[in-house]
Amino acid sequence: MDFKLLQEKIVKNAEGYGKHYGIKIDEDFALLKLYEEVGEFAQAILIHRNKCRPEKRLSEAESKNELAKELADVVGMALVNAHLLDIDLEAAFEEKWFKNKQG
């Protein structure tokens, strides 16, 4: 999927969420939501590694699926933050990760 199209779809979804629940999707909300999602991803890692209470344990397949969903939430909220801050992430990736890099 095209990166910009993905970002547009995620932002539209976030805006729909805000409208449905009467929440203003602004920079404050997006940053705090990103923190929340990172925490949920960390919890999913603990569960995946069985470093949790026994009643929270899942099968390998279930925990891997939860990891993927929580990481998708982290990336999604990062994209919402980029949109709200008017940051071109494609250009930022190019400059930060790929420009003048060897190997």
Explain the meaning of each model-derived region.
Residues M1-L71, V75-G103:
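Flexible "arm" and connector segments at domain edges
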